[in-house]
Regions:
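Internal helix-turn-beta structural module
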Residues: 302, 306-322, 326-327, 336-400
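Extreme N-terminal starter segment of soluble prokaryotic enzymes
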Residues: 1-4
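Short glycine-rich, Thr/Ser-proximal phosphate-binding strand/loop in the N-terminal lobe
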Residues: 12-59
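Short glycine-rich phosphate-binding loop at a beta-alpha junction
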Residues: 82-95, 144-146, 324-334
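Glycine-rich phosphate-binding loop of actin/hexokinase-like ATP-binding domains
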Residues: 153-257
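Catalytic phosphate/nucleotide-handling subdomain of diverse soluble enzymes
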Residues: 221, 226-262, 268, 333-364
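Short beta-strand-loop/turn "lid" adjacent to the catalytic site in phosphate-handling enzymes
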Residues: 73-125, 152-161
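A mobile "lid/hinge" subdomain adjacent to the ATP/sugar-phosphate binding pocket shared
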Residues: 259-304
Length: 400
């Protein structure tokens, strides 16, 4: 079975063609600058097939982008499948499912209407996701489509975790609550952790640290999300590449009054000009640049790295308390998978809860392995995330 995985943005579209049963990747690529001057990238994973890198392809809409993807996949010379009939289903990443979706679903007219009702909760993402779905429906009639939601995994959180301490009417009338994000990633690595530990996921207490330009930590108890650091939006929680994370709301009023910022300007600062970029005094939002700066004696770069590790460590301690213990801590995503120094910073000081790192095992990038010492009571795991494979697996389970 082959599943085409689509992640549609407002002017871009990422795609992968996978076999969810074996995990085999047949092809992947990217459509960029849709609606502007289209750039198309195609990377077949079969031997002897030639890639296409940032080629000029007219893509006035997402329909042309999807058409370019399909044409490349079935191309007589460099395609990876013989015909469109070999695409059994399409899995779509959808950012926000609100409270309507606690799991992935086959897309119907009713599902599309419900996704559109969630647009106000993710105005930058959901409308683009919907455009991608509609383009595929037009070009691939009869092929089953599945929506996989970033928020769905966290719908198992109890009210004590998701309810904000503001007038309850805002939850009842406006659905203001903690939703959490990166759910597909947290779900995937939690499943892999159970496999690595050789234990049923129902018996495990896991803390998943998805650390990248966007970062979140999730407590997974018995395979279910019970707490997570992102909130109503992906702006909450940890300081990230350019996002502030948790901040005293009174600061916003203070700065808006003092400098005359509009709400839009204030949100732009919090989303685009904060996080480790701000902590490093504008040096970079990239942790590699921050480490280089810190090594050269830049105290602000050092502060940015230390602050990030400090906040992750706080969440690990808090989530262990929420679950009454922890069996394993997982590091994943760009920073989590590739930054051995930051992993050590985070783990340092967690010895009291039974964490004991193996420095040699930790000195690796992007390789699935145990990075704690053999006698560590709490295991520490490095697990590269694979959201596309998780989407393909969910899709196959629903339509297979």
């Amino acid at each position: 079975m082959n599943v085409l995985v689509i992640n549609a943005g407002s002017s871009s579209l990422k795609y992968q063609l996978l076999n969810p049963a074996t995990g085999a990747l047949l092809a992947k690529g990217l459509c960029e600058r849709i609606g502007i001057d289209g750039k198309f990238t195609y990377k077949p994973q079969l031997e002897g097939k030639e890639a296409i890198k940032a080629a000029d392809v007219a893509m006035p809409t997402h329909n042309e982008a999807i058409a370019a993807v399909l044409n490349a996949l079935v191309d007589e010379k460099n395609g990876v499948i013989g015909s469109m009939k070999e695409i059994d289903a399409v899995g779509h990443r959808v950012v926000h499912g609100g409270e309507k979706f606690a799991k992935s679903v086959v897309i119907t007219d009713e599902v599309m209407a419900a996704i559109e009702e969630c647009n106000p909760l993710a105005p930058l993402h959901n409308p683009a996701n919907i455009i991608g779905i509609k383009a595929c429906q037009q070009l691939m009639p009869g092929v089953p489509m599945v929506a996989v939601f970033d928020t769905a995994f966290h719908q198992t959180m109890p009210p004590v975790a998701y309810t904000y301490a503001i007038p309850y009417e805002y939850y009842e009338n406006d659905k203001v609550r903690r939703y959490g994000f990166h759910g597909t990633s947290h779900k995937y690595v939690a499943s892999r952790a159970a496999d690595m530990l050789g234990k049923p996921i129902e018996s495990l207490k896991l803390i998943s640290c998805h650390l990248g330009n966007g970062s979140s930590v999730t407590a997974v108890d018995g395979g279910k999300s019970v707490e997570t650091s992102m909130g109503f939006t992906p702006l909450a929680g940890l300081p990230m590449g350019t996002r502030a994370g948790d901040i005293d709301a009174g600061i916003l009023e203070y700065l808006m009054n003092k400098y005359g910022y509009s709400i839009g300007e204030m949100l732009n600062i919090l989303n685009k000009k904060s996080g480790v970029l701000a902590l490093s005094d504008g040096v970079s939002s990239d942790f590699r640049d921050l480490e280089e700066g810190a090594e050269k004696g830049n105290e602000r770069c050092a502060l940015a790295r230390e602050k990030f590790a400090y906040e992750v460590k706080k969440l690990i301690g808090a989530y262990a308390a929420v679950m009454g213990g922890v069996d394993a801590i997982i590091f994943t995503a760009g920073v989590g998978e590739n930054d051995a120094l930051e992993r050590m910073r985070i783990a340092s000081g967690l010895e009291y809860m039974g964490v004991k790192m193996d420095e040699d095992a930790n000195n690796v990038r992007g390789e699935e392995r145990v990075i704690s010492a053999t006698d560590s009571k709490v295991k520490v795991l490095l697990i590269p995330t694979n959201e596309e494979l998780m989407i393909a697996m969910d899709t196959a389970s629903l339509v297979g």
